[in-house]
Amino acid sequence: MGNGVAAHRYFAHGQFETYTPIRWILGFLSTLGAIGPITFWVIQHKAHHLRADTTNDPHSPKYNSWFYVFYAWTFPQGNNEQEYLQDRYAKRLAVQMMRDPFYLFFHNHHYKIILTFSLILALIDPAYFLMYALAYCVDFFRLGAVNYWCHRSGYRNFETEDATTNNLLLGWLGMGFGWHNNHHAHPGRLILQHRWWEIDVEGYIGWLITKRP
């Protein structure tokens, strides 16, 4: 939910609009995913879509090791964040986001929120903290698996300029995150289901919390 629905579909792609209280909830969920501040996540993901499977892709398995694609790209110093910010589009996007008090709050307090939440869970019951840590590890692996395997093996519904594929296992177990070729073909589309078996749970969640007129 934090990475898939919040950071990815809502903040990075703006696939749906939602109510202000839910927007703040999504901000906290994205932060608790611990993959980096929302601003960093959005900028690197935009770079991924603009330069997918090129030497400038932040985490293409075509040019990077599996360890880098799964793990190391999440550290700003590991994927040359300054190079992103030298790009005019990325720099403009970063400036726009940092002018918004919402993004500025989560950017400035990213690690404080994670540490405070973890401490509260541990004080209530260490088992709660362990559950959070386990959920984080599972979601982290899911993201890495999509970044790696959905650019190497699977089937394609659309002929895109990159090597993206759909992966049945990651699509089903990843709540729709594995329909990667569908997503790269239509990055602004909320529901990624193109064939009947491509169940997109994250897309359905996004639809449920979409702001109604």
PLM features per residue range, with description:
Residues 149-155:
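Flexible secondary-structure boundary motifs
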Residues 92-101, 156-179, 184-186:
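Active-site-proximal inter-transmembrane loops
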Residues 1-145, 149, 179, 189-213:
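Non-catalytic, topology-defining segments of multipass membrane proteins
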